[in-house]
Each structure stands twice: as structure tokens, then as C-alpha cells.
């Protein structure tokens, strides 16, 4: 399995340029590029061509643009903005050689029926699939384990992906989000591993379902999530692609970027290596 770095892990103590240099130094294979902050910051002083050249001349490669945010159940103006943003992302993907865009569902205090959420999500993802197909880009739906997210369990997200029925539309499986809203491990064991495009690894303090927030994440293997169950299930269903470490821990932002990136790799590999070999 290949190792990826999600830039949320150094959100407040690094930038894209430094993330790339340190991930290259410490042997990461991939990086998920944050499009809402770190990429725009980089582009103030560099071009996309500069970034493409960096990837061309180094081991580390771009895995995904993270993320197309709140894509479903939008008003007409919001919908048009999502489509426009996604089309722009496709050009970025083409320039950099990115194969995935992470799509995050709407988070809202408004109550929306699950049927309406599924209908909107499937319709938008189908349109995005059509747009992405000529670029060879895949869309990875990331359910978010929070009560106010419109798609907040593995089962709900998997049902939407099945409704879309496109080869280039799949899931992000995030251990934190899976745990945070009580998704069922049996559902993962029965899933098609080909529908899981990216695995986000993390861990968390032991708060009740519905109370967990991103800031509660801790280094893999140092929290309450049964990562052994997640990893063994992923292996069982044939997933063996990329594991991406994603944390949002405020106290980790107080470390040096290098210490964060190094520790993230060490703790991830210690957990994952029990089930998957590191690919050369």
C-alpha cells in the first residue's frame, strides 16, 4: 500500500511548498492538495507549471484535490458555483496529473430528508462524472461523521455511490468519520473494495457518537478507533491502494512541520504494516 499525506495534518504549521519538501524527504508517495487554502497560497508566488515540474522531478506525486465542498442540495446559484469550480479543478488535474477529486457533502442545520439528499447527491455526482470522464479523473465522495452533515455514514454514502453507478465515482473511507457516527463494520466487510478510492487513516479520543469533532483526532494507533478491524476489512474486500494520514489536532499544529510529518508517517506505518506491505 502506498503512503499519502493529507495537508490538513499541517494546516497551521506549514504550507504546500514545505509539505512537499518534507514529505519527499520522509518517503511519502503521494500528497492530497488542499484547494481551499494551501494551493491558492502557493499560487501567489508560483505557477501550476512550477508545481507540475516539481512532481515530474521528484518521487512524491499528487493523489487528490481536496476538496469540492458542499456539492449537494444547493440552491441554483450554489449549484452553478459547484459546477464551475469543478470544471476549473479538471484543468488543474490535467496540468498536475491528479487522478482524484474529493467531494464533501453539504453540512447544514437545515433538516433534509434522506431521500432528497440521495436524489440531489446522485444527480450532481452523475453530472460531475460526465465532466470528469474526458480528463480521466475520479470523484471520491467523503461522508463526514457529524450530525449536521447530509451524508454522515458509510452506509448512506455507499448507497449513493451505487445509485450513481459510474466507474469514476467512489468513496473516501475515513476511519474517524466511520467511527464518529457509528457506521457498521459489517457494512464495510460486504462492500466492493473497488468502490473505495482513498483511505484516510486517523484515530480519536473516546467521546460518544455524535460528539466527536475533527480536533479530537490523534495519531493512528493512539486512540479509541478499532483500526485493526478497519484494516482487516479493507484487506478482505480487496482494497490495497493508498492510505492517507489526515489529522486536525490543534496541539500537533504547535509542533514543527517536520516533526508532524515524520510522526504521522511512523504512527501510520506502525498500524498499517500489520496488514499491508509498503510498496516500493
Curated annotation (Swiss-Prot):
Name the pathway it acts in: Polyol metabolism; myo-inositol degradation into acetyl-CoA
Any idea which UniProt keywords this protein has?
Isomerase, Metal-binding
A single GO molecular function term of this UniProt record: isomerase activity
Reaction(s) catalysed by this chain's protein: scyllo-inosose = scyllo-inosine
List required co-factors.
a divalent metal cation
- This protein is called Inosose isomerase
Cofactor detail note: Binds 1 divalent metal cation per subunit.
The family note in this entry says: Belongs to the IolI family.
Stated role: Involved in the reversible interconverion of 2-keto-myo-inositol (2KMI, inosose or 2,4,6/3,5-pentahydroxycyclohexanone) to 1-keto-D-chiro-inositol (1KDCI or 2,3,5/4,6-pentahydroxycyclohexanone).
Cite the InterPro entries for this sequence: IolE/XylAMocC-like (IPR050312), Xyl_isomerase-like_sf (IPR036237), Xyl_isomerase-like_TIM-brl (IPR013022)
According to its UniProt record, the EC number is: 5.3.99.11
Q: Where does a divalent metal cation bind?
A: 142, 174, 200, 246
Q: Which domain of life is it from?
A: Bacteria
